[in-house]
Amino acid sequence: MRSLIYRQLLYNSYSVDLSDEITNIGAEKKENVTVQIGEFAQSQYAPVSWGSGETLSGNVEEQPLDGPYTPDKSNLPSNYWYLINPSNDGVVFSVTDNSTLWMFTYLVLPNTAQTSVVVNVMNETVNISIDNSGSAYKFVDYFKTSSAQAYRSRNFLITAHRLQAYKRDGDGNISNYWGSDAYGDLRVGTYFNPVPNAVINLNADFYVIPDSQQEMCTEYIRRGLPAIQTTTYVTPISYAVRSQRIARPNEDITISKASLWKEVQYNRDIVIRFVFANNIIKAGGLGYKWSEISYKANNYQYTYMRDGIEVVAHTTVSVNGVSVYDYNTGSLPTDFTIRNYDVLKESSFVYVDYWDDSQAFRNMVYVRSLNAELNQVQCVGGHYSFALPVGSWPVMQGGSVVLTFDGVTLSTQFTDYVSLNSLRFRFRCAVSEPPFRVTGTRISNLYGLPAANPMGDQQYYEASGRFSLISLVPSNDDYQTPIANSVTVRQDLERQLDEMRREFNELSANIALSQLIDLALLPLDMFSMFSGIRSTIEAAKNFATSVMKKFRKSNLAKSVNSLTDAITDAAGSISRSSTLRSANSAVSVWTDISDIVDSTDNVVTATATAAAKKFRVKEFTTEFNGVSFDDISAAVVKTKMNKLNVVDEEMLPQIITEASEKFIPNRAYRLIDGDKVYEVTTEGKYFAYLTETFEEVMFDAERFAELVTYSPVISAIIDFKTIKNLNDNYGITREQALNMLRSDPKVLRSFINQNNPIIKNRIEQLILQCRI
């Protein structure tokens, strides 16, 4: 592009420090995904790869292989694989309900000739025949269904690793492994004779494997156990909790102690409560459109009892990997539209940062052996009514997800007053019944939890569990370790941004049209609108650099190539989804910064893409300084910024970026070819008409594609429908029509001064769209 601002936006590159680069890398990873790290995040840097985050070695909820355990005779829990590793031949497994099933497994050693053996099993002496001529171990199942029957062999497993596994499902059916891996028929078989309450007797050392890890169990059968297998901590499965106990739920255990430091293990029962919060932003216009329904980080303080002691707790909830949906019924001002709304899905994660006033959190700096167990939480959405000016209100209702604990790490919560060392509990989302829908629309039977009303009728969601950690703390209990990297207390940027957005949008009605046109006559661009805020060139340069970093990752930086592809690919159908912004080529206050201009020119020459070279958007300039849509946007921003109470250097780049993405989303652009005008909109509509009569003619897509490469592209403040309506009702001269097509500000001002309702209404509608 030829204008300075777009050279800066699309091609400029400044030297930045490491934190800026990490922030930029993080921004590239959130394409079509809403990422809300939270008000009280662990650090200011976004993760390079979105996902569940770091998983520590001691944070697995269920260990894939837990054991070994000594032989056991009990009613073992269902839906777990019990992998036995016998050291001697003989009966290694038996089960009976004394009415419908008697079953046992006999291990036959390699190279055993056929012989008869007598075994004592389940209070019965049994004579069986065994043989194994091969070089591998053979597990043979013997089976009968009544006490009067004789045992007979049913199935067998041949394995080189002396391993067999058993599982009892929820119905009580027994499954184990049959066949041989050497012959390619290793498989899981099931005896459909339910024994749900029968005692299982394991006569060998065994390991416990969750049912979800069946493939791993099969690999152990085929290839043997790992070289080293030790139990590092209490596993959360029923058997281990019942048979072992490392510590009571709430106690402090001194592991080691020196003169200055000691290691203390903290075991705590905890109750985690959290409350989802959201942003619901209504777009401008007649009241039928919503621009955003999104999750936002939220903190919550509460108390609960632990061993008779009141605990004061503080949580902060945030989300990651949220899916973004939209709904659009049409382009009319009265068509119901939701541009973006967030939904928690299977790929989403919920983070809850937890802190309480107990001793465990006083010195949480040097920590090891961090473990936690939490129950599941089901979150069910409620109702949210979209209050339309006329007609029945659509209602978004339903939706549900189940949160399953997925890990725990250390974090730091930054509030406006204090920094808190915390534990960040990570929950994985799974969709559940019921689905959500919006009444009166096509949105129905979708699964997930939308952000419209994620709390439903709940005051808070609650998860109970416990955690354990070993912390290196001072030997003097009265001393508290300083929180690392917390030199100053960070003010809540998101809260300030919300206040600024709200104040910004409330000022829309206070801008006079005549004042707006006066401002639009100035050589405004997205930088010069802030010329009154920074008084020195150096400050202006730094501020411009900060804004540029924000812009480089926005949709605006990609819009030119997107429109080029759309025009090239569509033969007669113009459609595009991203926003193209025209630029004003007039010199602004920022052109005085010579080093920025020189750097920009060099970068443009070196890095301009082929598509950008072909699609050259030339600015249409006359002696009147033509007004463009960007001038309207810039004038609104400048006027509102002058009235805002809060102006912060960190927040302004964020506001500018949001303005570039969301200001005047319904745009029109036109090309003038002699007495013929081509006009396209960002909503995919296109038409051509004559300047003399405003009669619509056939849209020549090939001619338009040719013109758009070499001719000026004008932002149409007064679109074709408005000009035609003005001509039909008031009558305008050919010269006035041409000036309207060229967006001549003098003509616009004259119509506004005459209180022309058609032109005035058009400008007012543009201003109403200027919302963030």
From Swiss-Prot:
Record GO cellular component, one term: host cell endoplasmic reticulum-Golgi intermediate compartment
Region span, Spike foot: 509-772
A Pfam family assignment: Rota_VP4_MID
Site positions per UniProt: Cleavage: 232-233, 242-243
Gene3D superfamilies per the UniProt record, alphabetical: 1.20.5.170, 2.60.120.200
Coiled-coil annotated residue ranges, if any: 483-510
Record-linked InterPro entries: ConA-like_dom_sf, Rota_A_VP4, Rota_VP4_MID, Rota_VP4_MID_sf, VP4_concanavalin-like, VP4_helical
Annotated spans, Spike body and stalk (antigen domain): 247-478
This protein's record includes keyword Coiled coil: yes
Location of region: Spike head: 65-225
Region span, Hydrophobic: 388-408
Motif annotated as YGL motif, chain positions: 447-449
Organism superkingdom: Viruses
Gene Ontology BP annotations: permeabilization of host organelle membrane involved in viral entry into host cell; virion attachment to host cell
SUPFAM superfamilies: Concanavalin A-like lectins/glucanases (SSF49899), VP4 membrane interaction domain (SSF111379)
Site positions for Probable cleavage: 245-246
Keywords: Capsid protein, Coiled coil, Hemagglutinin, Host cell membrane, Host cytoplasm, Host cytoskeleton, Host endoplasmic reticulum, Host membrane, Host-virus interaction, Membrane, Outer capsid protein, Viral attachment to host cell, Viral penetration into host cytoplasm, Viral penetration via permeabilization of host membrane, Virion, Virus entry into host cell
Recorded family membership: Belongs to the rotavirus VP4 family.
More details: In group A rotaviruses, VP4 defines the P serotype.
Protein name in UniProt: Outer capsid protein VP4
